Structure formats: C-alpha cells, structure tokens
Amino acid sequence: MELSESTKKALKAIPLMRTKAGPRDGDSWVQRLKEEYEALIAFINNNKAADLDWFRLESNSDGTRWFGKCWHYHNMLRYEFDVEFDIPVTYPTTAPEIALPELDGKTAKMYRGGRICLSDHFKPLWARNVPKFGIAQAFSLGLGPWLAVEVPDLVDRGMIQPKTA
C-alpha cells in the first residue's frame, strides 16, 4: 500500500499506541483503551481543524464494542452510515473488522454482515505496525479510503441515497 504525502502527514499526526494489549489483558487493556481514546480524540480534532470531519464513534463500557456514524460527501451531498465493530480477542495483532450494516450486499468489496474488505491493502500494513496502530489508524487507512472509493460507485449505481435533513 503506497501512501500519498497528505496521507502520511495525517497519519503522523495520530498518536501511536504503546501498549500491546487486548480485551482479555486486564489492566493492560485499560491502558490500551486510554491510548486508543487519546488517538481518536487527536484524529477527530485534526480532522475538524482541516474541515474534514467524517465520523463519530463511541464504545461500550469495556471498550470491546464500538458504534457510531460515518459520512462521506459526494457531489455536494452527504451519505451517512451506521458504523460498528467489535475488538477481536486477539487485538491488536488482529485488526478490527469495521462494518457498515446497511450496505451489506450492495458492493463486492464487503463481507457478510456489512464488514468492509480491507484484506489486500490495509491488513499487511496493520500487521507490520502491531501494536502501534489502533482504531484511529484503522479509520484513517481503512474506512476513510474505502468510503472514498465505494460511495461514488454506489451512488452511480443507484444503490444509496443521500442523507436528508
């Protein structure tokens, strides 16, 4: 996966994780979650400062289930989707599988349940950066580019409609 200079710059502005811990790792997981939230807050603030705000995310109390909204603008129209994912027990070795359930079956670049396909480009990059990458990097390098490619195609094929006020 070759990254553009603007992508590299945006990625460098997201804090990296220091703790290699998953949901079964007790206090280490609590520390990892703190790092995840700090990175997400920095990523969202950077996006807002650049007028590139495109998602909201929250988790359950133990940080194992995440949900929210993401959106993409195409031809001056906003397309908004529910986004969700679970943290795998093997996290951070295994990247989360981000899902947009309402798009299930509408594109070939998706698995059952609306999980977006990231295997060819993103997963090797994730594997090389364990444990430094986290949720913010998964959104920056996974979901964001996926939306940029798939939303225009889905619109052109008449598969999705813009969000109405």
Swiss-Prot record:
The keyword DNA repair does not apply. GO terms for biological process: protein K69-linked ufmylation. The keyword Cell cycle does not apply. It comes from the Eukaryota. InterPro entries: UBQ-conjugating_enzyme/RWD, Ufc1. GO terms for molecular function: ubiquitin conjugating enzyme binding; UFM1 conjugating enzyme activity. The active site is at 117 (glycyl thioester intermediate). Keywords: Ubl conjugation pathway. GO terms for cellular component: cytoplasm. Belongs to the ubiquitin-conjugating enzyme family. UFC1 subfamily. E2-like enzyme which forms an intermediate with UFM1 via a thioester linkage. This is Ubiquitin-fold modifier-conjugating enzyme 1. It comes from Brugia malayi (Filarial nematode worm).
